[in-house]
Amino acid sequence: SGTIINISSQAGRRPFFLQGPYCAIKYALNGLSETLAHEVAKFGIRVVLVEPGVVRTPIFGKNALPDEDKEHYEMLQSRTVRMITKGLMETGCDPIDIAKCMEEIVVSENPKMHYLLEQDARDNIRVYDEDGPEAWIEDGKIEDDDEYFKVQKERYGYDLS
C-alpha cells in the first residue's frame, strides 16, 4: 500500500506554443499515471497527479530561441514571455502550494486522481475543453499581438498581455 504522487502540469491536458517537448512529456506522464493507477489499485497503491499552472520559478528564463529560429518564432517567444510574466505576477503558483497539496494527498484516505492547482490552470483547461483544439489552432493564425491578446482576454476573462 502507499501513494505515488507525480508532478505533471496543465500542459499535460492542453498544448502551449513553443512548449511541444514539455507538453509531450506531461501528456505521457498523465497517461502513464492513469494507467498505473488502474494496475496497482488492487495492491492498495494510489497514484495521484498534481497539475499546477504557471509556477513561480526561474525555469522560463531558459527558453531562449536558437538564432536560426528567431526569424520564424520570435513573435511566439515574445507572447510566451508576456503571458508567463503576467501569469507569474498575478496568478502563478508558489512551489510551497505544491508541497502543501502533496501533504494533503499523503494524509488523505481517499485522494482524487487529479489536483489541478491554481485558477489559471483550471481556466486554461476549462476553456480548451469547451472551445476545442480548433479554436486554439485558429488563434495561432493571429499575427497582430493586440488582436491576439484581445481574443485571449475574451476567451479567458482576464488580461494576459
Feature-to-residue mapping (PLM):
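Active-site loop immediately N-terminal to the catalytic Tyr-X3-Lys motif
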Residues: 14-20
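Active-site helix of classical SDR
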Residues: 25-28
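Short-chain dehydrogenase/reductase
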Residues: 114-125
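Non-catalytic terminal and boundary segments that flank Rossmann-like NAD(P)-dependent oxidoreductase
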Residues: 87, 135-161
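Active-site-adjacent segment of SDR/Rossmann-fold oxidoreductases
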Residues: 14, 35-46
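Residue(s) in the substrate-gating loop at a strand-loop-helix junction
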Residues: 9
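Rossmann-fold scaffold of SDR-type NAD(P)-dependent oxidoreductases
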Residues: 6
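SDR active-site lid
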Residues: 42-112
